[in-house]
């Protein structure tokens, strides 16, 4: 079907490709400047002259097109910036030139990622062709135990489903454990839907959603829900009580194990941040583990946005983290994509709160273990992978 896109996003890593394709189409003006969002987050600030020049070209194009929703370096990661600024709305179609654009499904939007050429088509017409995906229903009954977080739940589901188990499916999340997740936790969950192959991940909007969007939504919205008698290609039911702290081991996101099975693994670096776990709630969890203590390995913390950083400063979270010996970097993607601000050396091991641990992701010969902020912080204290329940 040919669908009308409500909001389109491309960041500094993909917008230049989309802009070049747009120009090759000999288009002069975008379909609607107010519906395009351009954040600089992937290599921000620029790490080379080449990156700086490409960013300069994007800024010039943004000015030429009179695009008002441009977010400079330091404003934050695209998948945090869009929700904070009210673009992620229930019932809307959001498309981003980034695979983790499915994050916005946490607000009841249909959100997905596309390539730069498809984004150029959206820039030009505001439309894009989609194959309507079949749906999976995942229900998580009961409540998560103390010290078990949204990231643990997410990794557990990916481990059960596999990296291709939900390929091109719309995965809908239900159950008490899902309802009890904060908005930030739901963003973590939907952010990683792509890691099981999903086209999108969706949490039905509720009062938590609407409260978050008060005084924030950029437009009126109408929530959309599945019919009570909707049929699904597959349905899965899990018990939240079965979930303990999880770790995704190198070099696949679905290589998931309970933390106890990898406890004691040597760690060279800990990274807490990214579009998966760089929100205020995540920093607060890390601070609760590190308060009054000192990290024993280099620990990099990168808030997901400037607003997140300011909030963490205001409520004392950042002071706790800095006193614990962490390194603070500019809000953005940081070393997640292996470009700057903490890439790994040969054979080094990192516990990261990111969403991918592929070989070469943070350095060609590094090893990445994905975990929650609590597990990451606990590991920063001991210098080895550690169960946060023991701290």
Swiss-Prot record:
EC category name: lyase
EC number annotated for this UniProt entry: 4.2.1.114
Chemical reaction(s) catalysed: (2R)-homocitrate = (2R,3S)-homoisocitrate; (2R)-homocitrate = cis-homoaconitate + H2O; (2R,3S)-homoisocitrate = cis-homoaconitate + H2O; cis-(homo)2aconitate + H2O = (2R,3S)-iso(homo)2citrate
UniProt keyword list: 4Fe-4S, Iron, Iron-sulfur, Lyase, Metal-binding
PROSITE patterns: ACONITASE_1, ACONITASE_2
Pathway per the UniProt entry: Organic acid metabolism; 2-oxosuberate biosynthesis
UniProt xrefs under SUPFAM superfamilies: Aconitase iron-sulfur domain (SSF53732)
InterPro entries: Acnase/IPM_dHydase_lsu_aba_1/3 (IPR015931), Acoase/IPM_deHydtase_lsu_aba (IPR001030), Aconitase_4Fe-4S_BS (IPR018136), Aconitase_4Fe-4S_dom (IPR036008), HAcnase/IPMdehydase_lsu_prok (IPR011826), Homoacnase/IPMdehydase_lsu (IPR006251), IPM_dehydratase_rel_enz (IPR050067), IPMI_cat (IPR033941)
Domain of life where this protein originates: Archaea
BP terms from Gene Ontology: L-leucine biosynthetic process
GO molecular function: 3-isopropylmalate dehydratase activity; 4 iron, 4 sulfur cluster binding; homoaconitate hydratase activity; metal ion binding
Annotated residues for binding of [4Fe-4S] cluster: 275, 333, 336
Quaternary data: Heterotetramer of 2 HacA and 2 HacB proteins.
HAMAP family: LeuC_type2 (MF_01027)
Function: Component of a hydro-lyase with broad substrate specificity for cis-unsaturated tricarboxylic acids. Catalyzes both the reversible dehydration of (R)-homocitrate ((R)-2-hydroxybutane-1,2,4-tricarboxylate) to produce cis-homoaconitate ((Z)-but-1-ene-1,2,4-tricarboxylate), and its hydration to homoisocitrate ((1R,2S)-1-hydroxybutane-1,2,4-tricarboxylate). Is also able to hydrate the analogous longer chain substrates cis-homo(2)-aconitate, cis-homo(3)-aconitate. These reactions are part of the biosynthesis pathway of coenzyme B.
Family stated for the protein in its record: Belongs to the aconitase/IPM isomerase family. LeuC type 2 subfamily.
Listed name of the protein: Probable methanogen homoaconitase large subunit
Source organism per UniProt: Methanosarcina mazei (strain ATCC BAA-159 / DSM 3647 / Goe1 / Go1 / JCM 11833 / OCM 88) (Methanosarcina frisia)
Species classification: Archaea, Methanobacteriati, Methanobacteriota, Stenosarchaea group, Methanomicrobia
